[in-house]
Amino acid sequence: MHWLVNAGYHVNCNARFAGCYTSNELPHFIKDMDYAYRGDPALGRRIAECASAAGVATRAHEIASLELEYGTLVPMRYMNGDDRFKVVSVAAWCAWHSLDDSRRFGAALRQAIEQGDGRVAVLASGSLSHRFNDNNSPEAAMHQISREFYRQVDLRVVDLWRQGDWKTFCAMLPEYAELCVGCLLYTSDAADE
């Protein structure tokens, strides 16, 4: 999911993904990571169709040279080492988007899954608050949240999720995303349930 795009949502839905990945952002953390996963083109196309029908600009891509990013590769390394799951990667880190676009995309994602006949797990990779520590210090604080304020708000968000208090969470989401440099990019329509 950590795939930055400048416009619209993009779905990478090749039949097969394989390569050796090194992060452009932090090559000293993630480097020379070999990967090979099966994809699910039908699901990817369905996601794009449902989202576009909901008014969210979305494109499905089956381009062999369109590689996976670490937001997909890192979770797959730990959860799909046996290639048990098919992979579809969604660019949900849009440089210019609204939270309502993200909400509608989440609802369309759910619709696309429900229209299929398989079992699907959705993994949202990223973080809650999302601000790296100051330059030259990432290793020193690699396992820490960069600011205590962000940590406290993140803990509150997790509590709201555990309680199923989607109404309160959705009400605070715009400020949370802004004030905590949020990487929470879309929500499903769980608040309607």
Regions found by a protein language model. Name each.
Residues 1, 63, 124-128:
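Short, well-ordered beta-to-alpha junction loops that form the rim of enzyme active sites
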Residues 165-185:
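Feature marks hydrolase-like catalytic cores characterized by long aromatic- and Gly/Pro-rich stretches
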Residues 93, 97-147:
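Active-site beta-strand/loop microenvironment that shapes enzyme catalytic pockets
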Residues 186-193:
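Conserved small/polar residues in nucleotide/adenosyl-binding loops
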Residues 1-50, 58:
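A short aromatic-anchored loop/beta-hairpin motif
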Residues 30-38, 60-63, 92-100, 176-178:
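Flexible, glycine/proline-enriched loop segments at strand-loop-helix junctions
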Residues 139-164:
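Gly/Ser/Thr-rich active-site loops/lids in small-molecule metabolic enzymes
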Residues 45-99:
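Internal, conserved structured core segments that host functional sites
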